Amino acid sequence: MRRAVCPGSFDPITNGHLDIISRASRLYDEVYVAVMINKAKKGLFEVEERIDLIRQVTAEYGNVRVESFHGLLVDFCKQRDIPAIVKGLRAVSDFDYELQMAQMNIGLSGVETLFVPTNPTYSFLSSSLVKEVATWGGDIAHLVPPVVLEALNERLRKD
């Protein structure tokens, strides 16, 4: 069985993330979405909320599993016999950082990293940008799945 992982914080998941996950799900038999736990960062959504949102928006693919992870991604991969990491690249600045990570990961464990160019529609998109625009009342309906838009609006009304 061909397996891959799409890692990230996904706070929240965007249409750009979803595009990469969707494309990976067509290339691999099983795709894990690994939601990073970073206790040093306070996210807008708790990890379990992010996992729930991702499960909802990836359910139609049928071969996507969503789990949290803490620590080294290569350890997550080793525990699940995952030989490949799939990463979307938006710009040259992404490539510089991701190449360093890919070289470290293959050196640590032999896990390969495959870079997927981002759909140009989403080349500017990040979770941080989505949160910033949403905080100030901007229209983000075209940037996130409807269930995420609803969750964001609800969360921002509370805060």
Predicted regions and their residues:
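Nucleotidyltransferase catalytic core that binds NTPs
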Residues: 1-159
